[in-house]
A protein has these predicted regions:
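A short beta-strand-loop-beta hairpin characteristic of the jelly-roll/cupin
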Residues: 18, 22-55, 65, 168-195
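C-terminal functional regions that serve as terminal interaction/effector modules
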Residues: 149, 156, 160, 164-165, ...
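Double-stranded beta-helix
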Residues: 72-121, 212-238
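Exposed loop/turn and edge beta-strand positions of beta-sandwich/beta-sheet ligand-binding modules
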Residues: 11, 73, 152, 171, ...
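A short, N-terminal "cap"/entry segment at the start of jelly-roll beta-barrel domains
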Residues: 1-8, 94-154, 233-238
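Conserved metal-binding segment of the jelly-roll/cupin
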Residues: 19, 46, 52-73, 79-84, ...
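Conserved short histidine dyad/triad with adjacent acidic residue
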Residues: 1-2, 10-28, 153-169
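Conserved hydrophobic/aromatic beta-strand scaffold that supports enzyme active sites
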Residues: 12-16, 33, 50-52, 58-60, ...
Length: 238
């Protein structure tokens, strides 16, 4: 089988692009995103719109959008890819197409693309976010990705020394710290983490986080797919 899944519905992988490299324009059924770990000068082109991919950005590639990427900088760039490929394999609407021109023409350059959440925006939005009154999460914001209904995207801010209240729910979640360090407990496993790491909380495992440093924690989840199907359950620890 195609045993690549990070969770039942989600897959993640790290990617490096070297200066001068380009990926030809293509499209596929799965929805995708990138969390940019280290980059100066790389870019993405989605449906003819070119925008930067800089350190700390989150970049979207909704299913069946023409897209490619390249790198005009002078140092390697690194990011974390996240897709719903396992779900697409299960349901079987897997399609892929290369652009007939190889590299599609850039129709416009837009640093403020709706497919890009900048690091500056993420910092500002999490600073303004309200605290979770139940204590399960940090100051958390859901990023808008209406064209990608199978993947929910969150960023949350945890202060140094902050611990969250333990919970479990019927959704898969992949976490990646964008800033800071800490330890999370998933099920019975204690997982130390730092910037650029990735760890997964499969469905119905207890989850809690402890931040050692001020932290911005990215997560992607199938929670909203579960809500749509009326499968979603949430339980807080006593």
């Amino acid at each position: 089988g195609n045993d690549i899944a990070t969770a039942k519905t989600l897959v993640n992988a790290y990617q490096m692009i070297l200066p001068g490299e380009e990926a030809k324009t293509h499209r596929h059924a799965p929805h995708a995103l990138r969390v940019i770990i280290e980059s100066e000068g790389s870019f993405s082109v989605v449906n003819g719109e070119k925008h930067p991919m800089e350190t700390g950005d989150i970049v979207l590639t909704p299913g069946w959008c023409w897209h490619g990427h390249g790198h005009d900088g002078d140092q390697p760039a690194y990011w974390l890819d996240g897709l719903d490929v396992p779900l697409t394999h299960l349901l079987e609407p897997m399609f892929f197409e290369e652009h007939p021109d190889g590299f599609a023409a850039v129709e416009r350059v837009s640093p403020d693309s709706p497919y890009r959440f900048t690091w500056e925006t993420i910092l500002k939005r999490t600073e303004r976010a309200a605290a979770d009154t139940e204590g399960h999460f940090g100051r958390r914001v859901r990023l808008e990705a209406d064209e990608m209904p199978t993947i929910g995207i969150y960023v949350e801010r945890l202060e140094a020394g902050q611990s969250t209240r333990r919970y479990r729910h019927s959704a898969n979640v992949v976490f990646s710290p964008m800033m800071g360090s800490g330890v999370s407990t998933v099920g019975d496993a204690d997982i130390p983490w730092g910037r650029g790491d990735t760890f997964v909380a499969p469905t119905w495992n207890w989850i809690e986080h402890h931040a050692i440093e001020d932290t911005i924690l990215f997560s992607m989840t199938d929670e909203f797919l579960m809500r749509f199907a009326k499968y979603y359950r949430f339980e807080a620890a006593a």
